[in-house]
UniProtKB/Swiss-Prot annotation:
Domain of life: Archaea
Lineage of producing organism: Archaea, Thermoproteota, Thermoprotei, Sulfolobales, Sulfolobaceae
Organism, scientific name: Sulfurisphaera tokodaii (strain DSM 16993 / JCM 10545 / NBRC 100140 / 7) (Sulfolobus tokodaii)
Protein family according to the UniProt entry: Belongs to the GTP cyclohydrolase I family.
Entry's Gene Ontology cellular component terms: cytoplasm
Name assigned to this protein: GTP cyclohydrolase 1
Subunit field text: Toroid-shaped homodecamer, composed of two pentamers of five dimers.
Transmembrane portions of the chain: none
């Protein structure tokens, strides 16, 4: 109950300031089209920054050796095309793109729940961010998780609205950022293998 009250108070306080910003810009926040805008913006901002106020999701693990699956150690698992949106911390404008996560199964032969990787991406995206930090945080979270992988590689590819709608107004440029941990760190062949997997999957995808 207290958390709900705090949330409502935050919405109220943010909405007040959005209303003030509209007035400073020369708008009338009482006109029909803008009457509910401060509340809508407040709720949207709270949703897009929810990672600041919630604990990191736990990564559920599955031990494949217990399921009779042999030769799983050293297998590369790739979760690709994880759509995400975040807020550029410099302009508070959207970053929209995809993240690909690869990891090498460790000696304990544990793998991560599919949806849990997606939740980790969304968790670190739900805050003011820069893409370079985002991929690092995702990589660290998975590398330090209970699956104990031998290596992690995270690739982010996104459009940044701060360059799309203002400044240079470039509609085509995207930012590619890569974070590596463990065996991926110093092994170019492993990194290239992941890039080849992504390229091959584009040509053979059923979706």
């Amino acid at each position: 109950m207290e958390e709900t009250l705090n949330q409502e108070k935050m919405v109220e306080e943010i909405a007040k300031r959005i209303r003030e910003i509209l007035e400073i810009l020369g708008e009338n926040p009482d006109r029909e089209g803008l009457r509910e805008t401060p509340l809508r913006v407040a709720r949207a901002l709270l949703e897009m920054t929810s990672g600041l106020r919630t604990p990191q999701p736990q990564i559920k693990t599955f031990n494949l050796s217990e399921d009779g699956i042999s030769e799983v150690e050293d297998q590369i698992i790739l979760v690709k095309n994880i759509g995400f949106s975040s807020l550029c911390e410099h302009h508070l404008l959207p970053i929209i793109g995809k993240v690909h996560v690869a990891y090498i199964v460790g000696q304990e032969r544990k793998v991560a729940g599919f949806s849990k990787i997606i939740r980790i991406v969304n968790y670190y995206a739900s805050r003011p961010q820069i893409q370079e930090r985002l991929v690092q945080q995702i990589a660290d979270a998975i590398m330090n998780s209970d699956i104990h992988p031998k290596g992690v590689m995270v690739i982010g590819d996104a459009l940044h609205m701060c360059a799309y709608v203002r400044g240079v107004k470039d509609r085509e440029a995207s930012l590619l950022s890569v974070a590596t941990r463990g065996l991926f760190k110093n092994n170019v062949s492993l990194r290239n293998y992941v890039f080849r997997l992504l390229e091959t999957s584009k040509k053979t995808s059923l979706l």
